[in-house]
Amino acid sequence: MRHRHGLRKLNRTSSHRLAMLRNMSNSLIEHEVIKTTLPKAKELRKVVEPLITLGKKPSLANRRLAFNRLRDRDSVAKLFDVLGPRFANRPGGYLRILKFGFRVGDNAPMALVELLDRPEVEETENVQEAE
């Protein structure tokens, strides 16, 4: 029986799955939006949301826990210096998963994973280049 079984296997060994979710977490924290398959996106939510909750309480112990899970100093710094204060008043639900059609090669369902409350990117550079 699969009662209370935590994560999807995603057809990978445990070490591959851990490395993949760690890399995807780092990419999401760095770029704030990534495109991936829908099952991976749903698993990524289970990994990243507790990390952002850690980032809301800046202590040395929480930084060490986050580094243990991410293994990237730049991601940990952004997590505690940028994302933690940004989501300080939000009690959870820091990610949005948008269905994004199907992949051309194998028809896998794709999704966009993005952090909420992203700062808007100004289009002034593109407007100046067009003129």
Curated annotation (Swiss-Prot):
CC annotations in GO: cytosolic large ribosomal subunit
SUPFAM superfamilies: Prokaryotic ribosomal protein L17 (SSF64263)
GO biological process per UniProt: translation
Entries under Pfam families matching the protein: Ribosomal_L17
Single GO MF descriptor: structural constituent of ribosome
UniProt KW keywords: Ribonucleoprotein, Ribosomal protein
InterPro entries: Ribosomal_bL17, Ribosomal_bL17_CS, Ribosomal_bL17_sf
NCBIfam families xrefs: L17 (TIGR00059)
Subunit and interaction comment: Part of the 50S ribosomal subunit. Contacts protein L32.
Family: Belongs to the bacterial ribosomal protein bL17 family.
Entry protein name: Large ribosomal subunit protein bL17
Source organism of the structure: Burkholderia mallei (strain ATCC 23344)
Gene that produces this protein: rplQ
